[in-house]
């Protein structure tokens, strides 16, 4: 799966810190 899957998607703090995963 992709790092940014889930209810918050790429708007979550973790995904902002790891944007290349999106």
UniProtKB/Swiss-Prot annotation:
Residues that span the membrane, as ranges: none
GO CC, alphabetical: extracellular region
Origin superkingdom: Eukaryota
Disulfide-linked positions: 3-15, 4-21, 10-22
GO MF annotation list: sodium channel regulator activity; toxin activity
Compartment(s) where it occurs, according to its Swiss-Prot or TrEMBL record: Secreted
Tissue and organ expression note: Expressed by the venom duct.
Record-annotated site: Important for activity: 13
Major subcellular location class: secreted
Reported function: Mu-conotoxins block voltage-gated sodium channels (Nav). This synthetic toxin inhibits tetrodotoxin-resistant and -sensitive voltage-gated sodium channels. This block is very slowly reversible. Causes seizures and paralysis, when injected intracranially into mice.
Note on domains (UniProt): The cysteine framework is III (CC-C-C-CC).
Similarity-based family: Belongs to the conotoxin M superfamily.
Name recorded for this polypeptide: Mu-conotoxin CIIIA
Organism: Conus catus
């Amino acid at each position: 799966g992709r790092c940014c899957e889930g209810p918050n998607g790429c708007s979550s703090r973790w995904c902002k810190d790891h944007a290349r995963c999106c």
